Every structure is written in structure tokens, then in C-alpha cells.
Amino acid sequence: MASLRLPAQLVTRGNLIHHNSSSSSSGRLSWRRSLTPENTIPLFPSSSSSSLNRERSIVVPVTCSAAAVNLAPGTPVRPTSILVVGATGTLGRQIVRRALDEGYDVRCLVRPRPAPADFLRDWGATVVNADLSKPETIPATLVGIHTVIDCATGRPEEPIKTVDWEGKVALIQCAKAMGIQKYVFYSIHNCDKHPEVPLMEIKYCTEKFLQESGLNHITIRLCGFMQGLIGQYAVPILEEKSVWGTDAPTRVAYMDTQDIARLTLIALRNEKINGKLLTFAGPRAWTTQEVITLCERLAGQDANVTTVPVSVLRVTRQLTRFFQWTNDVADRLAFSEVLSSDTVFSAPMTETNSLLGVDQKDMVTLEKYLQDYFSNILKKLKDLKAQSKQSDIYF
């Protein structure tokens, strides 16, 4: 099997081009150039390439092939073997749990961290340490794997390109070189319509890169997670802290990550879905104000809402562009601006449900999800208050 070569733009940040732009544009991504042999650099350490490596700050070279990790040709791989990348995240952990419940052999790729992901081992998964920002750590994690489910995303303090573009390109190329049978990639709904937003452009370019890689794959675009609303609205309201909203009528069809995991594994078993682009959306699209109002009703108390006009986000984004050290902040503000514009992040699920053989009535609604959360948390708070009163004994 041929050794893998990483695209040159992974290490030369200034020469990237936009997927719809001419080659003279700068600062944009190019999924086509990633696939072009003349734009690749060897991953083998050699004396001739060492100076080039130093100039471009390339990570330690890595050979990505079956031979590189002592995988004998013809080694059988169980169809139930899955590698979940980003397994500790909001979606990743639900994928792991669902896959284990359905009898899959689950391996979890997680970054080395001071607090190990013991809960994944407790569930029955195997945990391996690797880092997408260090491509040389990837190949060993793919040995004996049939399917990769990619839930990974960069940390807030990292440049968006580090994991979400450079790391994903390296992972996809390693998967191709090592004969992975299927690759599931999660993207963002409408990412193809917002090339001005770095994160959405990256998602779209990764979709195209995966499509052209030749890997058997499924791409799933998502609108939003219900779980994210807990920290954003539910908890601050209960703690009588400010919640942040905008004056825009953006609507998002939030979906329970447990439903996303369930539908993903159904899609995984359906060979007719190979190579398809699916969009998963919740039963209804909600505005920020509607979500806040629902939380207020379920919590039984009013929210302290701080409204940020969309115009402020736009101005702030432009100001941060003046300073190199704030570029990543500006990238994230660009995404926030899209979320705060007059946009609907939703899609009809009729065709997808029919393809997967699922019933829309089985999907968790946002009302049900938040009602369960507030019921549980308010009961716990009530019990804690009762215990506190019982312990208040004065002499």
C-alpha cells in the first residue's frame, strides 16, 4: 500500500484558496489542491526534507500505511469494529454509548489529558490516546478498525484550522491509506452557503475532500444540539444569572444527541446510504426568545436576558481583524453572526426518515427534553433543600 503524503497547505497557512475562488485568492481553503499529488509533501523523515520541515514547522513525519503499524496484509477486520473520534464530546459520548448498547466493538480516540476518560472504559469501550493536530499519532489508532465515526472538533482556545481542517485531512488520508471501509463525517447544515465563515467553509471543504478521497462514506449535516441549551439557558436561569440572546429571528431545529446517535447507527447499517449527504434536524425550529420563554416556564422563574444586537457582532468582528492575535475570535464571531442572522437551520426529515425507516414521532422534542431536565434538577434541588433543613439543628 502506498505511503500517505500530506497536502502542502497543511503547513503553509498563507497559500490556501477558497473552494469557489481563483488561485490568486489568499487565506482560503482548497480541497482540490489537497488531492493533487504535486501539492503533497512526504511524511518520511529524510536528510533532504529536514530543512524544508524546519522552515514550515512541520510536525514529526509519519508513515501512514498498513506496513507502518505492522498490520499484515489480509488481516481480517470485524465489521463491528468502530473508532469514534472525539469520543468525550457532547455527540461523541452518545455515539459510543449507543454503539456499545447495539453490540459494536468501540474504540475511542481521545487526546492525552490529565483527567483520563475513565467513563468510556467503564461503559466497555477501549480508549486510545492520539491527537489530530499530531498526524504521527493517528495510524496506530486505525489498526483493526472497520468504520470511523468522526465527531471531533477543535477546542475553543485552538485555531479553527488546526483540528477541523488540518487534522481532518490527515485523518481521512490515513483512513484511506489503511483501508478503512466506511467513514462517517458530521458537518453543519447550510455550510455550503456561508463561505465567509471559516468554520462553515472548513466543513464544506472537508465534505468535498472526503467525497473525492474515494473512501466509502456518509456525511451528516447537523443543525444544533439540545444539550447545548442547558449551559446556555437552563443553568443560568436557575442560577439567576444573565442569559445572552440576539434580536434576530434565527430559527434552529435542535436535536437530541441520543437521536442523532440512533439514526447514525441505522444509517451505518444501510448500504443504500453509502456516499449520501444527509441532514438531521429536530421536529421544530426555535428562535432564541422561544427557547428562553420555554425555559422560564419550566423553571418557574423569569430570565435576566441581555440582548446583543446583530450589528454589534458585525462591528466586533471587524475590529478583531486588526489584531493578529484575535483572528480566531473573529472567526468564531463570524459563525455567531450567521447564527444570529435571519436564517433557518432546519430541513425536512420526511425523505431521510423514510430512507432510514424511522418514525418522526419517535424523535425527542425540545419541550420533552427540557421538561425532563427541569423536572429532574428541580427535584434534586428540592431534596437538597430538605436535607439542609434537617441538618440545621441548633443547641
From Swiss-Prot:
Keywords: Chloroplast, Membrane, Photosynthesis, Photosystem II, Plastid, Thylakoid, Transit peptide. The keyword Kinase does not apply. Signal peptide: none annotated. Residues 1-64 form a transit peptide. It is found in: Plastid, Chloroplast stroma; Plastid, Chloroplast thylakoid membrane. InterPro entries: HCF244-like, NAD(P)-bd_dom_sf, NmrA-like. Disruption phenotype: Impaired photoautotrophy. Seedling lethal. High chlorophyll fluorescence phenotype and severely affected photosystem II (PSII) subunits accumulation associated with a drastically decreased synthesis of the reaction center protein D1 due to a reduced translation initiation (ribosomal loading) of the corresponding psbA mRNA. Plants lacking both HCF173 and HCF244 display stronger PSII defects. Belongs to the NmrA-type oxidoreductase family. Component of a high molecular weight complex containing OHP1, OHP2 and HCF244, and PSII core proteins D1/D2, HCF136 and HCF173. Interacts with OHP1. Forms a trimeric complex with OHP1 and OHP2 that mutually stabilizes each subunit. PANTHER family: PROTEIN HIGH CHLOROPHYLL FLUORESCENCE PHENOTYPE 244, CHLOROPLASTIC (PTHR47128:SF2), PTHR47128. This is Protein HIGH CHLOROPHYLL FLUORESCENCE PHENOTYPE 244, chloroplastic. It comes from Arabidopsis thaliana (Mouse-ear cress). The gene is HCF244.
